[in-house]
Amino acid sequence: GDVYKRQAIGKSENMVCVASDALAMAHLTRNVIYLKDGDFASLNRDSITIWDRSGQRVNREAITVSSAPSLIDKSGYRHFMEKEIHEQPDAIAHTLSAMRESSSIEEKLADVSNLVILAAGTSHYAGQIGRYWFEHLAGLPVSVEVASEYRYRHPAHEKGGAALAISQSGESLDTLMAMRHASKLGLKSVGIVNVPESTIAREADFVLPTRAGPEIGVASTKAFTAQLTVLFSLATRLGLKRGHLTAAQVDIYETILRGLPGAVGQAISQFESVRTVSQYLKRAESCLFLGRGLLYPLSLEAALKLKELSYIHAEGFAAGEMKHGPIALIEDGLPVICLLDDHELSTKTISNLKEAEARGADIILISTQSAAEKVDFAKHEIVIEDCNPVISPVVLAIPAQILAYLTAVEKGTDVDQPRNLAKSVTVE
């Protein structure tokens, strides 16, 4: 059978240690041996002996991992999550550099008939946003699957498809097993991971790295925006290769990408302005998040961030779905948080907000400047500078993260290690 919890053996001059993640041993050693499926090992202070599943003694190569101790320090911030929010401009810039180094990936995927995105949690919401980009920019049919469900299904895929497995750790069991399932069904596999030594990175046919650096906080921030950066860049390059975009259009999108670290940095500069909203929100027992188009999946991610950090019940909905059921939840004082940009459909979203406000909801806007100017009935606003709507999920993710973080701080919860959660989920 498969190893359901990958083991890493760390070795230094006078000690041996074992963990499921090399990051846990970064303060002790950077020399790591990864066991393969079926391996078992005998350890003592001076030696490591490994046998494979057949009982044969084997040598497994030690590698030097990239997570230096200096990278897992809070660097003066109160929490790792706060630090990681502030690291996002650099994480995006480094990821863009990595994508430029992956210059042939569109050649390898140019002839795929469809994409299947496999992921869990925050990575799944990144995949949902990516679906819009692949459809719009590359003309590719895309399905986004919950990894824990996909691995037990018998999906009917067109021949010539590819599976994108998205995982910060590269060790998420459900995503790994879903990727293996997709490979057995004949799909090419592409891993989008933040840990280059991970199992998904080793087993995927192709790898697109996010270079966000070690992410310690359980609630993902910089890995999420780095994943979005990879997905957007890949979509534009596939769009050009498949003839769906012109070179001139791709140049425009490349310019947008080059400006992304700066746009994200500007959004982070609004950090303290979010505090007033968090002081209001900490008293809520429940709230709704709304978004439309690219911002619908971001509303799901924003709701996840708030619930996992502050333990406030939060649900995300497509704004147009409010009238099909969720509007029954509206009562006086219920916070309804809307992610809004100046898109061609923004007037429809504003109409949905008016319906909620008329029934007693407290409207909170997380929006770009020009979109905010169209709304005069919000109780609170978190406003960032305008950006191209095609990339707004990356930029608007920042104030959503800050709101969840500061609300949790106001409530006094364990921000970096929320209850009942783990950073890398390696069990079923």
Where do the language-model regions lie?
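Generic C-terminus detector
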Residues: 55, 387-428
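Short acidic-glycine loop/turn motifs at beta-strand connectors
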Residues: 11-14, 43-47, 52-55, 369
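Short, small-residue-biased leader/transition segments that mark boundaries at the very start
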Residues: 3-4
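Active-site phosphate/pyrophosphate-binding segments
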Residues: 81, 87-116, 206-335, 408-428
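Glycine-rich phosphate-binding loops that contact phosphosugars or nucleotide phosphates
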Residues: 110-259, 339-384, 403, 411
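A conserved acidic, glycine/proline-rich C-terminal tail/linker
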Residues: 15-37
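Catalytic P-loop NTP-binding/switch module of NTPases
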Residues: 48-107
